[in-house]
A protein has these predicted regions:
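Short amphipathic alpha-helix that is part of the acyltransferase structural core
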Residues: 1-34, 47-55
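Residues in soluble alpha-helical coiled-coils and helical-bundle/repeat scaffolds
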Residues: 25, 94-95
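Short loop/turn motifs at secondary-structure junctions and domain boundaries
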Residues: 36-42
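Conserved acyl-donor/pantetheine-binding loop and adjacent beta-alpha core of acyl/acetyltransferases
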Residues: 59-87
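Conserved acetyl-CoA-binding loop-helix of GNAT-fold acetyltransferases
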Residues: 90, 96-109
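Conserved GNAT acetyl-CoA-binding A-motif
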Residues: 111-114
């Protein structure tokens, strides 16, 4: 059975920051200010697990956004239609349970027709 996907909420912020920052340098470090700056430009911000204590999360950005990423900028220069998956992070306690697969599948399903 695939884990349930839900939208990230502000109740997830503290856990999201902790999960994210354990994975630096594989992902860019985040603090509250960066999260506040990113949130308005995200296309999708998804989570698996309890609100306030997610097992994993991901976020995507669409075209035409002022997003602070060299990889996103490259994608924007080369493609007009895309969904840029910026990060997928899974808590160590949840690895091997299909969390990342469920997040990738949800992003793919939402991107169809984009």
């Amino acid at each position: 059975m695939s884990p349930d996907i839900r939208d990230l909420t502000t109740a997830d912020d503290a856990s999201l920051l902790a999960l994210n920052n354990v994975e630096v340098p594989r992902v860019t470090a985040l603090d509250e200010a960066a999260l506040k700056r990113y949130r308005p430009v995200l296309r999708d911000a998804l989570a698996v697990g309890a609100e306030g204590d997610p097992d994993g999360f991901c976020w995507t950005v669409g075209p035409g956004t002022d997003y602070w990423s060299a990889n996103y900028a490259w994608t924007s220069r080369h493609y007009s239609r895309f969904v840029y998956l910026d990060r997928v992070v899974v808590a160590p306690r949840a690895r091997g349970r299909g969390v990342a697969r469920a997040l990738y599948d949800a992003v793919s399903a939402r991107a169809v027709g984009t």
